Amino acid sequence: AFNYYGLPVYSPESSVTLVPENFDRETNQVNQTIQAKIGVESKEDAPVGYLLDLGYTNFSHKYALSKEQDGPTEHTFDVKFDLNARFGGEQRIGLGGNVEYFNYSLPTMGGQEYLEFENHAEATLSPYYKVSGDNWNLKLGANIMFVTGDNSKFMASPNITADVEVADKTELYLVAGGKLYSNSMYEISQVNRYINPTMELLPSRNYLDGTVGIRSGIAPGFWFDVFGGYKITSDEVFFAPTLLAPSVQGDIFANTSRALQANAKHAFGGVNLKYSYQQLFDINLKGVYNSWNVDDIEDAYGKPEMELTAGITVRPISQVTASLDYYLATGRKTFLGRSEGEKMKNINELNLTGTYTLNDTFGLYLKLNNVLFQKYELYYGYPM
C-alpha cells in the first residue's frame, strides 16, 4: 500500500494557488496482484525444442481518483510458445511467440460504468533461423505483431542477433529487435505506481531496437563493452504530473501521474567497464548518453540525458561483503503546461549494502539508501 503524498500541481491557466491540505495525501492506495503460471520446456540441446508457458495475472487498484471511487481490475491471460528443430549440425529453425488477452472488470456508479478500458488481444509471432560457427553466432528472424480492438494495429520488426570473435576474448556484436509493449495496468504500475488509475494507455510499438558494440575480456580481471544504438517507437510513454484546476480541490488524490504518448526516436551510446581482483573486490562503471527526438510534445519528459552507474564490492573475508552503489541521472525535464519543459533535479544517489553469511542457509543483510541525503524527485511533486 502507498499514498499519493506528492504535492498537487496547478494548471498554468489558473491564477489560484492549490492548497495541499485540500487534497487527499493520506489514504493508502492498494495495488493487488495475483499471478499463476505453469509451463513445460525441453532440454536446451534437444533435437526438437519446445516451450509452452501459460500465465494469468489479476491486477486491481482499490481506488480510482479518490477513496469514494472503486478502481478497475485487469485480467491478463498469457500464452508463450516456441517450437524449433535442429538440422545440418549447428543450425536451427523455429517459431516463437506470445498471445495476451486483456479483460477488464470496471466499477459502476448509478448502475453505469464510469471508466473506459477496452477488452483486447495482443500477439507476436517470431519465425527465426539460427546458425553457429567456430567463432561466430547468427540469428535471423522477424517479429510480426498485431493488436485487436478499436485501436487495432499491425507491425513488423527485425529479430536479428550476431556476434563474431575478432581477437582473443574480444567480439563484435549486433542486436536488432523490436517489441510490442502492452502498457497494461499491471505493467505500467511496475514502472510508476503513481499513474492515474483511471487512464488506459495505447500499446507502444517498438519498430527497431538496435545495438552494435565491441566487448572484451582480454586483460586479466578486466572487461569492457563499448556500444551504441537506436530505437524507434510509436506511442512511447512519458510521465508528467496531472495538472489540476482549483475547481477539483476536495477529496481527490493530490498528485497522480499522467502518461503522455508520442512517437519517439532514441539514440544512445555508452561504455561499461568492470574489474575484478581475485575474490577481494569488484569495480564497475557504466556511462550512457541519450538523445531523444519526439513528435507532438516538446521534450522526452522524465528521461535522463546522461546516466552514470558505478559500484564497488569488497570482500575482506569470505563471509562478509560490503558494497557501494552510485547512480547519477541528469538532464531530466517535466511538463507543467508551458511550452518549455521544467528542469528537474538530478538523481544523485549512493546506497550502501552489507551482508554476513552465517552458513549455507542463513545470513544477515543490511541496506542503507541515499546515504548522502540528497533531495530529488523521481516523479515531479514527489520529493525523495
Feature map (PLM): residue ranges:
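Flexible loop and strand-edge segments within Gram-negative outer membrane beta-barrel domains
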Residues: 1-51, 55-76
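Phosphate/ribose-recognition catalytic cores of enzymes acting on nucleotide-derived substrates
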Residues: 56-58, 73-75, 82-92, 98-105, ...
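Short glycine-rich beta-strand segments
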Residues: 3-7, 57-59, 100-102, 144-145, ...
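Short, flexible helix-coil linker/hinge segments at the edges of structured domains or between repeats
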Residues: 9-22, 65, 70-71, 96, ...
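Exposed, low-structure sequence patches enriched in small/polar residues
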Residues: 137-141, 145-384
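One face of beta-strands
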Residues: 1, 34-38, 50-52, 75-83, ...
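Edge/loop elements at the starts and ends of beta-strands within beta-rich repeat scaffolds
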Residues: 43-49, 87-90, 131-136, 167, ...
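Surface-exposed extracellular loop regions of Gram-negative outer-membrane beta-barrel proteins
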Residues: 92-103, 107, 116-147, 276-287
